[in-house]
Regions:
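A broadly tuned preference for mixed-charge, low-complexity surface segments
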Residues: 8, 12-16, 20, 149-164
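C-terminal cap of metal-dependent C-N hydrolases
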Residues: 94-101, 106-109, 171-187
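Active-site neighborhoods of metal-dependent hydrolases
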Residues: 1-136
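Feature representing long, continuous alpha-helical segments
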Residues: 103-104, 122-126, 130, 142-145, ...
Length: 187
C-alpha cells in the first residue's frame, strides 16, 4: 500500500516541528465523484489502480464493476456520480490510527438508500469494534479522544470535545461490548 510512505512523510514533518495532523477512515476502499482529479487517468496510473477494482456507487450503474468503457462514460457523462475504489490493506489503517496525531474520520453526504459508501454511517462503530474491542490496539478512552477532543483541538472548534458547562453536549451512548457497524456496500 501507499499509506506507510505517507506516514513516514508526516512523521518526518512532525519531527521538524511542523504542525501536521491526519485522519483516516476504517475502510480500505474509498469513494469520490467520477469527475474528480482523483479518477483521472494519470492518477489511476500513478497509484496502480485497476478499473476492475472500482464499482459505481450511485446512479443507474450502482453496484456495477467498472471496465474502461463504463469508466469513460461515468467520467464524461456522469461526473457527479460516485465511484468506490478498492485499494489498501487493513493493517495500514490500524497502523495509521494508532499514531498520536491521527484522528478518526468519516464521510458525509446525502445518498439514496442502497447508495454511497458505508463510511458515511459505519466508520465510528467499526473503529470502536475493530481498534478497541477486537484488536485491542487502542483503549476506549484514547479511541473516544480521537473521535472527539482531538479533532476539536486540532481544528480549533470552540465548545466541542469535552463535557463542561457551556459546551455543546453532543453525546453518543453505546455498549462497548456490542457496538458494531451495520453499514454495507451498495447492492
Amino acid at each position: 500500500g501507499t499509506l506507510r510512505p505517507a506516514l513516514d512523510v508526516v512523521d518526518a514533518a512532525r519531527a521538524k516541528g511542523m504542525d501536521v495532523w491526519m485522519d483516516s477512515g476504517m475502510y480500505t476502499d474509498w469513494a469520490t465523484y467520477a469527475g474528480t482529479a482523483t479518477f483521472d487517468e494519470q492518477t489511476i496510473k500513478d497509484n496502480s489502480l485497476r478499473f476492475g477494482d472500482m464499482v459505481a456507487a450511485t446512479g443507474k450503474y450502482t453496484g456495477t464493476r467498472l471496465n474502461r468503457e463504463l469508466y469513460e462514460l461515468l467520467r464524461h457523462k456522469y461526473p457527479d456520480e460516485s465511484i468506490i475504489c478498492y485499494s489498501g490493506e487493513p493493517y495500514e489503517i490500524y497502523e495509521a490510527l494508532q499514531k498520536p496525531y491521527a484522528m478518526m474520520s468519516t464521510d458525509a453526504g446525502a445518498y439514496a438508500p442502497g447508495e454511497g459508501h458505508p463510511q458515511i454511517a459505519g466508520s465510528y462503530p467499526r473503529f470502536l469494534r475493530k481498534m478497541v474491542r477486537e484488536k485491542r490496539l487502542l483503549g476506549l478512552e484514547e479511541a473516544v479522544y480521537k473521535c472527539t477532543l482531538l479533532p476539536a483541538q486540532t481544528y480549533h472548534i470552540p465548545g466541542k470535545g469535552v463535557l463542561e458547562p457551556g459546551y455543546d453536549a453532543d453525546l453518543v451512548l453505546f455498549d462497548r461490548d456490542a457496538v458494531r457497524d451495520n453499514a454495507k456496500m451498495p447492492d
